[in-house]
Amino acid sequence: MELERALADESLGLDALAEALDRATPSERRSAVLALGRDTQRRLYRLAERARALALEDFVPAERAPREAVRHLGRNTLPLPGSLRFFEKRFSRPDSGAPRLFGYNETPVVRLVGPGYFVAVPTAGQPAWEPRGAVVVDYFRVPDAAVPAGWPRVVPNSRGLQVLVYHHTRDFMRRLSRHVTIGAAYKNERALDHYFVLVRED
């Protein structure tokens, strides 16, 4: 497939890669992006340092209503069985209209581990964070207002098994294309060398 070749081509520049991702059909984009392994994700995260800065609207487009959920399908590079590397991050805009998003992680083990709630905000004004990505998915914070109907109950990430996965963690996000973002995980300000890709579902 053309897109799979583009993602594997280490000589391909960021603009050409973004064009290939944007040109693909939704099913082609999902299939190719969710097949990316650790080495490729690491390379793409570094490549995306030169990308146009992300905005919150890349996760929840401006035309979406408050508390309307937007699904992003994902694959991570954690040392887990294959099926557990696939997940969803679900985002929504709060009623207040403040420059932040609420979200949680829908995983095969969400009932066992917990939802991993977060607040996503721009990193502008945070000199230590800005070079890592323009948006941070911050697990130190959880929603403090209403979330979409049907989402799990909001609980802090210090509770239960979540402490092993989400507690004291932040994900720093970069843009690959209109629908595709890539993130790097940090624990207590330490880079974990773990990455994940997201494909927004429209």
Region locations from a protein language model:
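Soluble ligand-binding/transfer domains with enclosed cavities or grooves
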Residues: 1-202
